[in-house]
Amino acid sequence: MAVQQNKKSPSKRGMHRAHDFLTAPVIAIEPSTGEAHRRHHISPNGFYRGRKVVKGKDE
């Protein structure tokens, strides 16, 4: 069974956990449609940076 060799102090434990928090995804607004989407991803209706890049089923 694994046993720690030295106890980790509360300060060191906190430093180890410093980057474990969750960050919210960055949301951008499509300028042509005003729709929200994740940065560097196409919007749900197929626009990216003001241009239509993906055709829909009805197009």
UniProtKB/Swiss-Prot annotation:
Biased composition (Basic residues): 49-59
An annotated Gene Ontology molecular function: structural constituent of ribosome
Keywords tagged on the record: Ribonucleoprotein, Ribosomal protein
Keyword Lyase tagged: no
Keyword Transferase part of the UniProt annotation: no
A Pfam family it matches: Ribosomal_L32p
GO biological process, one term: translation
Family: Belongs to the bacterial ribosomal protein bL32 family.
Descriptive protein name: Large ribosomal subunit protein bL32
Species for this entry: Laribacter hongkongensis (strain HLHK9)
Organism ancestry: Bacteria, Pseudomonadati, Pseudomonadota, Betaproteobacteria, Neisseriales
